[in-house]
């Protein structure tokens, strides 16, 4: 069978889609190659969320098209979010594309590759969800993987095109999620990252607003699942029961990904999100009281059409007061088909970049102070391997650092075993990364600490 090369862009949810498509292709007998120049078929799984992501996707398609002209490639398939938004335009403007595949068609990847008609569209099941029976080929290195618990979104945030791309909320059953978690553990995975457009909305489509709380407790019973974390939560969906479940479930890491997008009430109202600075501070207080030792990450958008100097100042003051462990900042880009598109783009790009820089510099100071406060503490660290720049240093992450976005722990001295959890004493805290050394006793000490935490629901750092 033909060799297939994959380029996967965008968020972890898109990565899961790519892994499912790879699983289907492998099941059909295709050979998967990491050497793109050898691939006879190239698949580009695109992201179309914001302007910069679209530009990156177009660049990847053009790169693949160049390989098609010069290399072994004879067929170029474009998949993902950009196809859902711009299928006809892509096919019209880029004759190099041989076929397109939308986000709700991923189980038909082999069928699309085998079709002769570039306009071929498989019969669509709008309720399609991958599950524990779907073939999936993991591409994440090491002992960490993503697990998508739902697809689609029922929110109507003014800036966001995701509901039109991914469709309405569709939750997997808890039995299916638990089964896949057990499959991942059997493949050597220690850390599972739960993802969805809004994980805290999980289960509401089948009538259970407490479904995520129950799922957390359910995953707490999975033997060998050392860590799992919740990404993409929504502020008004954080129930007391969910927070208690996080605090009381030993292998649920004390980490919360809570994208708030802004803090000024007027801007949030224009975003169709609601809330505001005082509401969010009360929420953060409750989170930190209920889940002691929790690490909180948030994301914010600067330069939204209704953002004035005063409303940005409100956001800046909130970030300073809230003292998050991690913050991401994005500049607003108007997206066709969203309610905010009609508001135009009145904030100059230069102003957006300045505001982003101000927030990031502020957060750097906060993160540095928080990381320095960890000096001398022993943290459980997932050792991911040797550092790319030197074999003398190993890299890893502690519970408060999600994959790819939150920095890491640089482990100096010794030879810690890769893809294991090790107790590491922090010797130095920087703005993004920590430096530490493995505590004598290594793996045995880590196992004892893990068992104690499972019994008590402890926070995982001393």
For each feature predicted by the language model, list its residue ranges:
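Short acidic/polar active-site loop segments enriched in Thr and Asp
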Residues: 98, 190, 226, 325, ...
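Terminal RNA-binding accessory module
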Residues: 342-462
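Proteins enriched for Cys/Gly/acidic motifs involved in redox and nucleic-acid/cofactor modification
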Residues: 1-202, 241, 252, 256, ...
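Conserved glycine-rich "GG(E/T)P / GGGxP" loop and the immediately following alpha-helix
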Residues: 48-53, 189-214, 218-222, 234-241, ...
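Conserved strand-turn element in the central/C-terminal portion of the radical SAM core barrel
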Residues: 9, 156, 160-167, 227-236, ...
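Short, electropositive alpha-helical surface patch
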Residues: 207-220, 240-254, 307-324, 349-354, ...
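Conserved, mostly hydrophobic/aromatic
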Residues: 157, 177, 194, 230, ...
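Radical SAM/AdoMet-radical enzyme domain recognition
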Residues: 186, 213-214, 218-222, 227-228, ...
């Amino acid at each position: 069978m033909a060799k297939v090369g994959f380029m996967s862009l965008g968020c972890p949810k898109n990565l899961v889609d790519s892994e499912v498509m790879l699983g289907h292709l492998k099941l059909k007998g295709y050979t998967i190659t990491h050497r793109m120049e050898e691939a006879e078929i190239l698949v580009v799984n695109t992201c179309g969320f914001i302007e910069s992501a679209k530009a990156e996707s177009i660049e990847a398609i053009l790169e693949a098209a160049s390989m098609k002209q010069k290399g072994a490639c004879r067929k170029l398939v474009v998949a993902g979010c950009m196809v859902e938004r711009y299928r006809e335009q892509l096919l019209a403007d880029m004759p190099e594309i041989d076929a397109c595949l939308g986000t709700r068609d991923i189980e038909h990847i082999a069928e699309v590759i085998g079709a002769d008609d570039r306009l071929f569209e498989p019969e669509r099941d709008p309720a399609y969800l991958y599950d524990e029976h779907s073939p999936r080929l993991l591409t994440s290195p090491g002992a960490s993987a993503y697990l998508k618990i739902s697809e689609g979104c029922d929110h109507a945030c003014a800036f966001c095109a995701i509901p039109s791309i991914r469709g309405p909320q569709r939750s997997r059953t808890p039995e299916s999620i638990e089964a896949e978690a057990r499959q991942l553990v059997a493949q050597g995975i220690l850390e599972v990252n739960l993802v969805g457009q809004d994980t805290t909305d999980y289960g509401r489509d089948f009538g259970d607003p407490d479904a995520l709380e129950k799922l957390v407790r359910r995953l707490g019973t999975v033997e060998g699942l050392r860590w799992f974390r919740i990404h993409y939560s929504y502020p008004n969906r954080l129930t007391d029961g969910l927070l208690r479940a996080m605090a009381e479930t030993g292998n649920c890491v004390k980490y919360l990904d809570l994208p708030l997008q802004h803090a000024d009430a007027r801007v949030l109202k224009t975003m169709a999100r609601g809330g505001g600075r005082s509401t969010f501070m009360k929420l953060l207080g409750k989170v930190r009281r209920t889940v002691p030792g929790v690490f909180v990450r948030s994301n914010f958008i600067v330069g939204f059409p209704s953002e004035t100097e005063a409303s940005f100042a409100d956001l800046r003051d909130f970030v300073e007061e809230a003292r998050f462990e991690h913050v991401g900042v994005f500049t607003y880009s108007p997206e066709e088909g969203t309610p905010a598109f009609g508001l135009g783009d009145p904030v100059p790009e230069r102003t957006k970049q300045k505001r982003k820089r101000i927030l990031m510099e502020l957060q750097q100071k906060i993160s540095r102070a928080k990381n320095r406060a960890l000096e001398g503490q022993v943290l459980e660290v997932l050792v991911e391997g040797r550092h790319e720049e030197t074999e003398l240093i190993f890299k890893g992450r502690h519970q408060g650092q999600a994959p790819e976005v939150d920095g890491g722990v640089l482990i100096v001295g010794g030879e810690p075993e890769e893809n294991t959890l090790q107790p590491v004493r922090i010797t130095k805290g920087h703005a993004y990364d920590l430096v530490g050394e493995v505590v004598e006793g290594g793996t045995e000490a880590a196992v004892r600490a893990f068992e104690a935490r499972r019994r008590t629901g402890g926070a995982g750092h001393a």
